[in-house]
Swiss-Prot record:
Record Pfam families: Tropomyosin
Species of origin: Sus scrofa (Pig)
Subunit structure: Homodimer. Heterodimer of an alpha (TPM1, TPM3 or TPM4) and a beta (TPM2) chain. Interacts with TMOD1. Interacts with TNNT1.
Main location: cytoplasm
Residue numbers carrying Phosphoserine: 61, 87, 271, 283
UniProt key word Transmembrane helix: no
Protein name: Tropomyosin alpha-3 chain
GO MF entry, a single one: actin filament binding
Membership in a protein family: Belongs to the tropomyosin family.
């Protein structure tokens, strides 16, 4: 009799354990179904996003073609203008050499002048010109320092956004690992759903890789358009500059301005790339 009671208790305990496992399996099955639905929604969104990216790539291809045609015309115009500028520069060089010789003769004549007051006035005017130029150079340097600080601030902000995205990605990966561990404990009823979930995940990864490929092509087209646009602007500026007046050629100032403009474009491009990366990773 005692053995029968023990047997009944064991059967009752097995029944309770079986019920617990059944409830746990049902809960995990529900979670797997919800996860499958979520991934299906993400898959549909990714397909829609890929369609938009393909349309946008077509648009960038047309824009790239137009920019290349404009660049060819501008480069031809710039080449003609540069040839004229080279000729004018040779003439300017001859004039400058003659001017140097004349200035040397003038300096020799001035040294022989007996009127010290006139020489002092000339020296004073020369000092004022030098002081004015030095003041302008200092103002320009201050402006460049301010612009450089702004560029550094943009780069620091971009680094901060990148670190924030990296932290979010680590959290998401941790959540995904825990979810996969719980899904592995499900009973045979959720096994088929897990297989379907794996297939959907593989499709999603494939689409993500495809999207990354399109994004890279998009970035490449954007960079090429940007480079061609910059070259077009530079060629047009050089042509207009040469046609307008050779006397306005101030090589040192132009080099500094071009270098500063390139740095601003560089930091702006870095900020935009990191913003795109942040948006893409957040949407994923």
């Amino acid at each position: 009799m005692e053995a029968i009671k023990k047997k009944m208790q064991m059967l009752k305990l097995d029944k309770e354990n079986a019920l617990d496992r059944a409830e746990q399996a049902e809960a995990e099955q529900k979670q797997a179904e919800e996860r499958s639905k979520q991934l299906e929604d993400e898959l549909a969104a990714m397909q829609k996003k890929l369609k938009g990216t393909e349309d946008e790539l077509d648009k960038y291809s047309e824009a790239l073609k137009d920019a290349q045609e404009k660049l060819e015309l501008a480069e031809k115009k710039a080449a003609d203008a540069e040839a004229e500028v080279a000729s004018l520069n040779r003439r300017i060089q001859l004039v400058e050499e003659e001017l140097d010789r004349a200035q040397e003769r003038l300096a020799t004549a001035l040294q022989k002048l007996e009127e010290a007051e006139k020489a002092a006035d000339e020296s004073e005017r020369g000092m004022k010109v030098i002081e004015n130029r030095a003041l302008k150079d200092e103002e320009k340097m201050e402006l460049q320092e301010i612009q450089l600080k702004e560029a550094k601030h943009i780069a620091e902000e971009a680094d901060r956004k990148y670190e924030e995205v990296a932290r979010k990605l680590v959290i998401i990966e941790g959540d995904l690992e825990r979810t996969e561990e719980r899904a592995e404990l499900a009973e045979f009823k959720c096994f088929e759903l897990e297989e379907e979930l794996k297939n959907v995940t593989n499709n999603l990864k494939f689409l993500e890789a495809q999207a990354e490929k399109y994004f890279q092509k998009k970035d490449k087209y954007e960079e090429e358009i940007k480079i061609l646009t910059d070259k077009l602007k530079e060629a047009e500026t050089r042509a207009e500059f040469a046609e307008r007046s050779v006397a306005k050629l101030e090589k040192t100032i132009d080099d500094l301005e071009d270098e500063l403009y390139a740095q601003k474009l560089k930091y702006k491009a870095i900020s935009e790339e990191l913003d795109h990366a942040l948006n893409d990773m957040t949407s994923i």
